[in-house]
């Protein structure tokens, strides 16, 4: 129990499961489970689960937080090369995302990044950084894509 936990399933509480399902399917992400209640997409090294926000609140025994707009968190898509940032932002735009920061030179690290929000305002950052970046190296190790 001294090693870090396996945390590779991201659950987003959503208001409209049908529109969110359609958005992520339009990105080309494969569905591994689908029902009227929730849907799970497979990503490289992780799963994305979309679950009704009110049911997520019940399951967590917490209050459902009302959406106020703005950004509070973002999930990062780790790009393998700089051009992949443009690729995913283009796919997201075609699927109906709002691109809030077009692909550009990153401000806070050496690399390239962009941001988009899905139809319900869940933010994603698409980022590329050189392999010698310590966060990139750790992300590759965490996904089982690096031996170092």
Segments predicted by a language model, with ranges:
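Residues within well-ordered beta-strands of beta-sheet-rich folds
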Residues: 11-13
């Amino acid at each position: 129990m001294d090693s870090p936990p396996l945390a590779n399933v991201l659950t987003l509480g959503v208001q409209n499961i049908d529109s969110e399902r359609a958005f992520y399917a339009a990105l080309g992400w494969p569905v591994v489970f689908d029902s009227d209640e929730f849907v799970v997409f497979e990503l490289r090294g992780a799963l994305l689960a979309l679950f009704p926000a009110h049911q997520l609140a019940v399951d967590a025994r917490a209050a459902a937080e009302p959406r106020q707009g703005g950004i509070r968190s973002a999930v990062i898509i780790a790009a393998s090369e700089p051009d992949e940032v443009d690729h995913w932002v283009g796919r997201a735009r075609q699927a109906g995302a709002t691109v809030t920061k077009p692909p550009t030179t990153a401000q806070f690290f050496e690399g390239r990044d962009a941001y988009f929000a899905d139809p319900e305002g869940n933010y994603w950052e698409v980022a590329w950084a050189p392999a010698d970046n310590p966060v990139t190296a750790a992300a590759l190790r965490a996904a089982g894509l690096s031996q170092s």
